């Protein structure tokens, strides 16, 4: 049974749940619906797990080439490919059904869209054929906090849009950092990530620009009245520090692999801090502009 847990990538599920909590509690504004919270977390976990299993199935031919993925269950034959497809399908159906019936149709729809982008667009095609695969994948990576938010609100409003911008822009430097310190793996597997296609100096520039872009929606969460001054202080501090770390990569004597690994680790600190602060420093009086509503 251990291999069936590992193939769902528990670390990725856990990381996504942190962002789900942030979005859910931000929308709750201090009024926590515990059953809805638990069921939303479970639903998102199942959908993310499904996407990860499908990704493992799709990537099994290149996972055997890459050092960090060569011991995955499907590569080593611990799970039959056909069984993994049934397993992934069951997880996905269960997760989407749970979000639909326990939360609302909008939360389920967002989960479906995120799943399609990750599995159908990114994993099946963009990852192997385009340098823009990371950009497309970032949209699916930003879905969980938006699902958490919309599970409460029942509508896609300006707050949900800001969350989508924050988490999708965060994904870019986070992912490029991985591609730099895992450069040889991606090169060996012929995956066209930016550092491999355009070079590490170009990737460093993109990382810096994306962090600058990321800082804008993080501030919008405060300026839009969704989060308070404590959030602002923490968000500003971690964003500026992250930017400083990115700029340190331009030093002549820098070890690119070590620098990228540190940048990657701090990206996790950054998004965790933001998720925690938007959970605890929400503004009850926030009145977002409604973009899409599925509530009667």
Swiss-Prot record:
Stored Pfam families: UbiA
A GO term, aspect molecular function: protoheme IX farnesyltransferase activity
Subcellular location: Cell inner membrane
Topology with respect to the bilayer: Multi-pass membrane protein
Keywords assigned by UniProt, alphabetized: Cell inner membrane, Cell membrane, Heme biosynthesis, Membrane, Transferase, Transmembrane, Transmembrane helix
Gene3D superfamilies: UbiA prenyltransferase (1.10.357.140)
Pathway: Porphyrin-containing compound metabolism; heme O biosynthesis; heme O from protoheme: step 1/1
GO BP annotation list: heme O biosynthetic process
Coiled coil regions in record: none
Recorded family membership: Belongs to the UbiA prenyltransferase family. Protoheme IX farnesyltransferase subfamily.
PANTHER family: PROTOHEME IX FARNESYLTRANSFERASE, MITOCHONDRIAL
Function field: Converts heme B (protoheme IX) to heme O by substitution of the vinyl group on carbon 2 of heme B porphyrin ring with a hydroxyethyl farnesyl side group.
Note: Carbon 2 of the heme B porphyrin ring is defined according to the Fischer nomenclature.
Name of the protein in question: Protoheme IX farnesyltransferase
